[in-house]
């Protein structure tokens, strides 16, 4: 294995970490209706916790309304309860086999809470990136110790790892800035 291989594997893991962060942050509420808002909702269905997506279709009806089309009529009440209990500040209303979820405007206090949550997610992602960097550096040290790479290759690899971390941390900051702007938009 070469230093390039170690860096490539590390970068692939960093990309996955960023994708995970983007998915995480998509579920943070803004003033607009988005299907990602209900991604984390788990419904008590058939004796187990199931993601909402496995119980019905979620669609955007308009800028402030989501519509959940439940496939099994017997699951409507459980789905409505799961959305209400998800601590998202939503008030779902059942209409036959569908559930209308109105997205109320965010209060200033709630907006600030969501900004804090967004920043927490970004910090968690940065920590994950730094841990991946540590893994890369450890692998490079091991390769040098085993005489598979030279000291120069190791130091180039360390510089590349640092550059990757800075690149992806900047990406996280850009994503957070955009999300904060969306959250604070009235």
Swiss-Prot record:
What are its GO cellular component terms?
A: cytosol
Give the source's domain of life in one word.
Bacteria
Which family is it part of? Belongs to the RRF family.
Lineage of producing organism: Bacteria, Pseudomonadati, Chlorobiota, Chlorobiia, Chlorobiales
Which PANTHER family does its entry note? MITOCHONDRIAL RIBOSOME RECYCLING FACTOR PSEUDO 1 (PTHR20982:SF3), RIBOSOME RECYCLING FACTOR (PTHR20982)
* Organism annotation: Prosthecochloris aestuarii (strain DSM 271 / SK 413)
Could you list this entry's UniProt keywords, alphabetically sorted: Cytoplasm, Protein biosynthesis
Q: Which GO terms describe its molecular function?
A: ribosomal large subunit binding
Question: Entry's Pfam families?
Answer: RRF
Name of this protein: Ribosome-recycling factor
Per UniProt, subcellular location reads as:
Cytoplasm
**One biological-process term from Gene Ontology?**
cytoplasmic translational termination
What is this protein's function?
Answer: Responsible for the release of ribosomes from messenger RNA at the termination of protein biosynthesis. May increase the efficiency of translation by recycling ribosomes from one round of translation to another.
